[in-house]
Amino acid sequence: MYDLILLHPPSVFDFRAKRQFRGPIADVIPSTDQFDMYALGLTSIASYVEANGYRVRLVNVGRRMVAQPQYDPEAHLRRLRARVYGISLHWLPHAQGALALARLIKRLHPSSLVLMGGLSSTYFHEELIREPAVDLVLRGDSTEEPTRRLLASLRRGEALDSVPNLTWKRFDGQVVSNPQTYAPAAVDAFDLPAYAYMLRSVALHGHLDDLIPYEGWWRRPLTVLLNARGCVLECATCGGSASAYARLCGRASPAYRSPERLLDDLRTIRSFSRSPIFMVHDPRMGGGARLARLLDGLAAERMPNELVLELFWPADATFFERVAASVRRWSLQLTLDSHDEALRTGNGKFACSNAEVESTIEAAFAAGCRNIDVFFTVGVPGQTLASTLATADYCERLLERFGHLRRLRLFAAPIAPFLDPGSRAFEDPALGYRRLATTLADHESALLEADWGRTLTFHSDAMTRDEIVEATYALTERINDLNLRYGLSSAATHAAVVVGIGRARARDTAGAGPLDSAWMFAKDEMNWPGSEGIRPTLRLAWIIATGLVEELRLIASRALGRYDGRVADEGVAAPPRSAVVRSDAPAASTRRPSR
């Protein structure tokens, strides 16, 4: 019997029996429209509590349901017994799937406890705890240690009043919300993601099907370096903005991972893959000294993998020359949101002129950048249908200037299906959004709509839901034509997207489903050149061998009743904001409306 089984649900639990047109809600992410890619925190929780002696397992229920038509989640979960079942509700599009999974677990294992966690769970914890199938909710962005304390209290038969960040129900049904006091200032004690844990689990326990991050990952793995928890920017529509983290997690500034820990993650990734490594967050967050340590370390590693960097504001030739001197192959991802400088500034990222954007692109290519992906968004504050269509003209301008290189790729996607809870767009009506869903139950119901346009739970003062849908199709049509003209996509890919958009406009759901979910962009357009499958190395063998030694240690510790021997001590005081390099959010974007 396990102490904890962590579960990742699909977006809609019975999607295989439903006829839904999910549209382009997942076209620019690696996973399918069931959002079968689990949050990185699930692996760090599993790794941390296991290191402290507890038996834990992670099951990507959503991925297995997507990839394996014969997979029966009820039969599988009936066989897996645990004291606590932890269900991820981090991203709000999992609202229906997470709650349905909680109800299934409570029916199959009524004497076990159902735990919910993630940022969306944090926001809606008071509503979640009233759900009969939910016994516990852990709040915040770093619940590794609170989860361990919860399991320790249950093992010792103690009351749960001392577990930080916990909302729970007593046996008589009384709801208790313990103080939310745990927000570690540093997160080096946790593996984010816990690649070594995943590799050991697969090698020693054969849990490959349960642990694959999303469908297709095994063939073309994309790995991640997590720079920090939290952010320095105030992007209006982002539930991971500075004010959202302050509101939901009590975090005054990001908790950065040290360059040394990032480099250790990189070595682990190299042990099993030569595929691209994506760094989440702008690497300049945290200051120049931290950036220098990271780049110096990368130069010493001489890693063969391509590094994909995310930029939040313009960069100059000096920065790119440092990057080029540190890694052999590197690419960029830029989220511009809009060509309109005022709209872009109001939302948060790249609050600068278009000339500065183009100067950044030019400097990056001059320094040897392999590819640059530029993302535009439909539905940012103040954006009209006409403004969205004008973005296509700017895309053409970018390709006129850089298209001959065939290394600039342009994408567009709507804010869909929901506004992020805790974001300024969700909280502040002054930004011009009109919410059509307020409660978790509202969002759960919206996910059952037959068409993605009806699933949208908002419109703006500038665009109706129908206009957001049409703007998405129209902008993507233009980008698709530009990609063909400039040799960035094949005739077959162009034709497939034309057919997809035509079917979308006609609301033709024939063949719709999670394995056929790329309507606006063919999925092969999102693949990074050079992606390769898994490959064994001596370091991988060493990781597995040390994992076996660790497994024997854990077995002995459990037999002797010795638990909680590797407790993290990261502190809870947030570092001062002086560590922040800069925030390009305008003054109006720094308002932090109270919940």
Predicted regions and their residues:
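Radical SAM enzyme core and accessory elements
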Residues: 2, 6, 55, 74-78, ...
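Short glycine-rich His-centered loop
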Residues: 2-34
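Canonical Radical SAM [4Fe-4S] cluster-binding loop centered on the CxxxCxxC motif
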Residues: 214-258
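Conserved SAM/AdoMet-binding glycine-rich loop
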Residues: 2-7, 115, 259-371, 401
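Flexible glycine/acidic-rich beta-alpha junction loops that bind and position SAM and/or redox cofactors
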Residues: 14-15, 124, 233, 245-246, ...
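Catalytic cores of alpha/beta
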Residues: 125-132, 382-398
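N-terminal [4Fe-4S]-dependent radical SAM core
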Residues: 16-19, 169-227
